[in-house]
Amino acid sequence: MLSQFSSQDGKQTLKDYFDVPLDVYPVGRLDYDSEGLLLLANDKRLNDDLLNPVNRHEREYWVQVEGAVTQEALEKIRAGVSINIDGRMHLTQPCFVESFDRPLLVGDRQPPVRFRKHIPDSWLRLIITEGKNRQVRKMTAKVGYPTLRLIRYRIQGITLENLAPGQMKMLSQTELYNLLQIKKRQSL
């Protein structure tokens, strides 16, 4: 599904699953082949604050990669790797990354990610504070481990915990700003 409300190339969109007011839109995006947490809001300031890299809001991803990841590869990701963004090389900011066992709340993907079960895979927990186009996929590929599955688990203090796939949870502006650690601006 596309993480937008307008259709494109006949692919399913948010409009096919959620009935929300016209002024509600996704804050940030997920790639077509990614899954996980997506915020929907009608607050333009939230979009600006959350997506501005100066504010360094954390995004946590659970990443299934092909192969048994080495410590050397993890160190390279931690330090920052050079990736291509729109035809220009970009050095990613240092980040947190660790190997971990497949999270319990992650079910099997439908359709399956791959059919070659004899090749090992690894799960990574990766936390970044910037959000370039397909950044996580490019980072893991750069160190030799293509991403098979990508799940955004957390944005700052908002997580997928206690949410089923496709489930929506309403938050007040105060709750949202507190969880995202965004200070409310004073009205003039």
Predicted segments — roles?
Residues M1-L188:
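RNA pseudouridine synthases
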